[in-house]
Regions:
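Hydrophobic alpha-helical transmembrane segments of multi-pass integral membrane proteins
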Residues: 23, 63-82, 102-113, 147-155, ...
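Membrane-water interface of transmembrane alpha-helices
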Residues: 31-44, 109-121, 159-175, 236-248
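Juxtamembrane inter-helical linkers in multi-pass membrane proteins
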Residues: 43-57, 121-139, 169-191, 244-266, ...
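Membrane-helix interface segments in multi-pass membrane proteins
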Residues: 77-106, 204-235, 239, 289, ...
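Membrane-interface helix-loop-helix junctions at boundaries between adjacent transmembrane segments
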Residues: 89-98, 118-147
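Intrinsically disordered cytosolic tails
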Residues: 229-336
Length: 336
């Protein structure tokens, strides 16, 4: 069994972040892309698996170029449609059409960004000198994405766990390390129970809170406090179940990944992070980042027989537009 580990320090990350913020302010935001690449390079270099560390090869210039391409492909059309609605006196039917077109552009942005950002980040990541790659086609993911949301709406949310596992299967099974690919064996039925429990609990709590407010049974503030204190742990539990299920059903060769994430561990991580951020007014962000990295790498292992030394490099070309798409609306499509 081989495990992951993280060796970074919050103090080092804080020093880097202070310099990055200062340079970003001086350059009126232009340094943001170089700062992002610098932080990633540090985090990857401090992440190890089976004793060997990862490396990040992306550059600020590539991220900046990707951002410009994303602006041309999605940003300009989206903001142009918004500007037309705001500044032109248009008939109601035309205004509605522009709103629909803007929504479509935004809807298309998400799957395109997911695929292309993953493609870029994989090809800019290496381990033992061998790079990862992602070979899924954007058009195939678009079909999956449209179908998933359509069926989810038609089934009143019941199809959502199946959509999520199909999405994960696409991303994992099209990811390669050198010349060998990862595989995903999960199925939507495996997440149906956690999803149903979370959804039912959410509806029940919201209905009870709404009823209490309508009948003035309790103080409004106390009633609303019930929502985060009850639903927060439930949704953290669902997140943990999803992460564990995804990794437990991911294979590489004859070996299978395994995650030791539990609700208790994940809740402790998030509560500790929240306390650190509140007590330091956000200054503990570097330590929160280190805590997260150490937690998620430490709970992941690869079990079974696999000869990693036999993996060969397989070079593929990639585009940085996906990275720019993620920066464009700040949705943060990082590696799952």
């Amino acid at each position: 069994m081989q495990r992951g580990s993280f060796h970074g320090a919050g103090g080092t990350l804080l020093g880097m972040q202070i310099v990055n913020v200062c340079l970003t302010i001086v350059t009126l935001g232009a340094y943001h892309f170089w700062a992002k690449a610098k932080i990633r390079r540090y985090l990857f270099s401090q992440t190890a698996f089976a004793g060997d560390r990862f490396a990040y090869h992306g550059t600020g210039k590539e991220l900046y170029q990707g951002f410009l391409k994303a602006m041309v492909v999605f940003g300009i059309p989206y903001f142009s449609l918004g500007a037309a609605q705001s500044f032109l006196a248009l008939p109601q039917s035309v205004d509605f059409l522009l709103q629909a077109m803007a929504a479509l552009v935004l809807f298309l942005y998400v799957p395109v960004a997911i695929v292309n950002a993953r493609r870029y980040r994989c090809t800019r990541t290496s381990w033992r000198g061998i790079r990862f790659s992602f070979r899924g086609r954007t058009v195939d993911f678009l079909k999956l994405y449209f179908k998933g949301w359509l069926f989810t709406l038609l089934t009143l949310g019941t199809y959502y766990p199946y959509f999520q596992t199909q999405r994960q299967a696409f991303l994992h099974s099209h990811t390669y390390f050198g010349n060998q690919r990862f595989q995903f064996t999960g199925h939507g039925s495996g997440l149906m129970v956690p999803f149903a429990v979370t959804l039912f609990t959410t509806y029940a709590v919201l209905c009870l809170c709404g009823l209490a407010l309508a009948l003035q049974l309790t103080n409004a503030g106390l009633t609303l406090l019930l929502i985060p204190f009850v639903l927060g742990p439930v949704w953290v539990w669902l997140l943990g179940q999803k992460q564990k299920y995804y990794w437990d059903h991911t294979t590489f060769g004859e070996a299978r990944f395994s995650s030791s994430i539990t609700w208790q561990k994940l809740s402790g991580l998030y509560l500790g992070n929240l306390a650190l951020l509140l007590l330091t007014l956000g200054w503990a962000w570097p330590w929160v980042t280190v805590r997260n990295a150490r937690f998620f790498t430490g709970t992941l292992s690869l079990q079974g027989v696999t000869d990693l030394d036999r993996v060969l490099q397989d070079t593929t070309e990639t585009s940085v537009t996906g990275e720019g798409l993620s920066n464009l609306l700040d949705t943060g499509f990082d590696m799952d």
